[in-house]
A protein has these predicted regions:
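Generic short amphipathic/hydrophobic targeting helices enriched at N-termini
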Residues: 5-6, 56-60
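Short glycine-rich, low-complexity segments
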Residues: 1-27, 67-71
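SH3/SH3-like beta-barrel fold
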Residues: 45-50
Length: 71
C-alpha cells in the first residue's frame, strides 16, 4: 500500500473531486464509489460521504485503492 500516494490524492481531491475507494475492514474488502472527502485528520484518517453509502471513516493505511471517480 502506498500511503504517500494516497495522501497526495487526498490532498489534491479534498473538496474538489469525487473518488472511488477500496479498503480493508477486518477480513473484508469494501468498495465505495463517487465519494466526497469531507474531513481528514492530518491524512491519518479520512471521512468520506455520498448519499447512498452515508458517511464512512477510513484509516489511510487500510486503503487498497483510491482513484478519481469516472462518470
Amino acid at each position: 500500500m502506498n500511503t504517500a500516494k494516497f495522501r497526495y490524492i487526498i490532498c489534491k481531491s479534498f473538496g474538489h473531486n469525487t473518488l472511488d475507494i477500496k479498503y480493508n475492514e477486518g477480513n473484508r474488502i469494501i468498495t465505495h464509489f463517487n465519494m466526497c472527502i469531507i474531513d481528514t485528520d492530518n491524512n491519518t484518517f479520512i471521512t468520506l460521504y455520498n448519499p447512498n453509502a452515508g458517511e464512512i471513516t477510513v484509516k489511510v493505511e487500510d486503503i487498497i485503492e483510491l482513484v478519481p471517480h469516472k462518470a
